[in-house]
């Protein structure tokens, strides 16, 4: 107070005012503050007083030859005075206007290429549709979101190497372009940017936008894909939202979405196979998404979703340290606990063995449609503050938190037996049993939980067992809040381990993820997902299994043919025939298999009875464990299109139709490809069965005596030549090889040479 009086007193004297307003500033500290360092201390002020001057801009001397001294209105564009401290001229802002209107025009061809991200954005906004504005309370939670649509997914280092290679190809420095995407992008950009006059630094900045994913931790209510984030300022305020439908797609959002679908399908399929982990890896390595290998996408894409993270863990990549339960992502924010096995009794007196977490802990729970803060002690929920889009979402979050708390009243609320199984028909672990039980019906759980009187707290309301809000009462410890809970912001990743059954644990042994946590939601992928693994043939139903099985045989016919004659058992056990078995009626599988195997054996024994079409057609049936019986079949049944359809043992049928003239195979009316070899020639298989270890020299030669039979051939010495009878009476000259060669090359060259010899 005293100081203020003193200052008022000083200001009332006229001399003080004059000193303060008129004298120059010569205090060293002040001069230092505004002159030291390159950083402008008051940019807007500086800009204002610079622009108030007549010639605030400096330009290269050459400008005087390119711009007239005065414009059409007679205003001076540049001063004859040169800039103090440099050999540049002082120029008026009017010169810029003149240049923009009358200056030289360079080629604009590179602009859309360099500024691609901007041009694309304009297109998206032009074709996007903005709907009505709604006024309502917005529950925003901070999430880590992708802020530049249309980018590739290179790491910062990879992008840096690409940019250096494209923009500054002659600069010294080690650049290693290894990944396929790096090489493709580099080649593409070098071609696009030939003779580009835009400043290299600008090109580098723009390339970075195109190549690297940039994420920010932003408050969002609604869509989180980059196409929605770029219009965040137009679609949601504090108390309003505007509907928006993006115009067009951007590849990065499509990749994220398709990756999640592929990962879910793969994890679900792997979980039911004999060795889930091996199967999962095999599928990840043989799947492509939009033409890019899935494993390459997994290495670069930071998407955090349960199935995606299981695939990453299997590949030995680091993942987020948060764990998943009931479809929510939990992150411990404080406290600690130790785990102990405990046996508990359900309301139905069934014993459950659960791993109890002893100790006080706090967690954030983040789901797609609801978020919460959970505070719990040993087997006790202390507090749950939940917020969500609607009643249903809030109820789901409450159920998950109640189960997570492991409270006794929750376990006692179980009515009936718990015997839920996963896709592989294995019993779920107790915590997931409870979760599934209450997801079906949580009435008893909510009724038994208990109710308490509540104090009114700003922004919070109570919730009753029937999910109606109340300001007086609430389920014990549970409140609904207007404010959302932010997602965990840290991007730190941890080393994890994964077991055979796809359970992912951190280094302390806590389970972070398991196949039970993978969402059952089905979606349609935006990019084409190509699963090359036979395990995924079932994904599109029985027809796809049928087509894929036969396509596989046709594509690999050369190898299949040799195995058929040399090592049939190995061929019958191939995993590619596994999916097919589900199409064959269970009761008769064994008989079919026995019948087909016997038929094949006769074909091997009796020369000239090899029939390509028939082998291809019947091979998948031979894969089941055979039952010996004297039964003969003229047709075999497969279950497709909801009923049994017949495949004729001899001849074509709607299921399996082979056109000998075009060599095209049609399965259920769909094209299944072309056989590269003519099955009409009965020689086609014999040569592979017989002529392994022999080189075909050409047509038969009388000087080498009469044609030998197949059996006599085996007596030849290495290097010895002989005529041999093959197929339907054709004679060729062969020589026994001097060294053993691969089965494959022998039979492939045999096929070609026999044709040449015969024709």
UniProtKB/Swiss-Prot annotation:
It comes from the Viruses. The record marks 627 as: Mammalian adaptation. InterPro entries: Flu_PB2_2nd, Flu_PB2_6th, Flu_PB2_C, Flu_PB2_CAP-bd, Flu_PB2_middle, Flu_PB2_N, INV_PB2, PB2_helical. Keywords: Cap snatching, Eukaryotic host gene expression shutoff by virus, Eukaryotic host transcription shutoff by virus, Host gene expression shutoff by virus, Host mitochondrion, Host nucleus, Host-virus interaction, Inhibition of host innate immune response by virus, Inhibition of host MAVS by virus, Inhibition of host RLR pathway by virus, Inhibition of host RNA polymerase II by virus, mRNA capping, mRNA processing, Viral immunoevasion, Viral transcription, Virion. Coiled coil: none annotated. Disulfide bonds: none annotated. GO terms for molecular function: RNA binding; RNA-directed RNA polymerase activity. A motif (Nuclear localization signal) lies at residues 736-739. It is found in: Virion; Host nucleus; Host mitochondrion. GO terms for cellular component: host cell mitochondrion; host cell nucleus; virion component. Influenza RNA polymerase is composed of three subunits: PB1, PB2 and PA. Interacts (via N-terminus) with PB1 (via C-terminus). Interacts with nucleoprotein NP (via N-terminus). Interacts (via N-terminus) with host MAVS (via N-terminus); this interaction inhibits host innate immune response. Plays an essential role in transcription initiation and cap-stealing mechanism, in which cellular capped pre-mRNAs are used to generate primers for viral transcription. Recognizes and binds the 7-methylguanosine-containing cap of the target pre-RNA which is subsequently cleaved after 10-13 nucleotides by the viral protein PA. Plays a role in the initiation of the viral genome replication and modulates the activity of the ribonucleoprotein (RNP) complex. Belongs to the influenza viruses PB2 family. This is Polymerase basic protein 2. It comes from Influenza A virus (strain A/Kiev/59/1979 H1N1). The lineage of its organism: Viruses, Riboviria, Orthornavirae, Negarnaviricota, Polyploviricotina.
